[in-house]
Structures are given as C-alpha cells and as structure tokens.
Amino acid sequence: MVCLPCIFLPIMMAIYMKFIMPYVYRVLPQRWVNFLDPILYPTCPVKIPEPENKKEVEEEKKDAPCCANTTEATVETVETKKDQ
C-alpha cells in the first residue's frame, strides 16, 4: 500500500505550482523572485565547452558559397542513375 504522503504531497505541489504560485509571485518583490527561482528550479551547473577552433569554423561557413555541397551531390546522383 502506498503511504499517504507519497500521494498527497505531489498533488498539493502541483496545485500550488499551477494555481497559487503565480499569484504569490505577483505580490513578492522582483528581488525575492530572482532569489527564489534558482532554489525552486535548479538547473545543471555544467557548461558545455565551446570548440577550440570556433573562429575557424565560423570563417569557413562565411567563405563557403551557399548550397555548394548540395549541387555537387545532386550532380553525382544524377550521373550514377544514368550509368545504371
């Protein structure tokens, strides 16, 4: 049998977050809301590392003509279809 808190607490938490919390946040000062948000809604502190050669990749994207690779691929597929 499931204990009462295992059923009661999630239901009450959902009701609070859906209906009561929006009204409470309107009354609280913005400074308190900014303080409480990271506590109530924690996020992962791990940062994704950026690539070391990010500038080189961006320059290559800028220098490459638009759709250059797709036209070559379509020509190759048309030629292979003709050969078969």
UniProtKB/Swiss-Prot annotation:
Membrane topology, as annotated: Single-pass membrane protein
Location(s), subcellular: Cell membrane
Transmembrane segments: 1-21
Major location category of this protein: membrane
A single GO cellular-component term on record: plasma membrane
InterPro entries in the cross-refs: UPF0729_C18orf32-like
Entry keyword set: Cell membrane, Membrane, Transmembrane, Transmembrane helix
Family according to the record: Belongs to the UPF0729 family.
PANTHER family: UPF0729 PROTEIN C18ORF32 (PTHR13456:SF0)
Protein name in UniProt: UPF0729 protein F18A11.3
Organism: Caenorhabditis elegans
Lineage of origin: Eukaryota, Metazoa, Ecdysozoa, Nematoda, Chromadorea
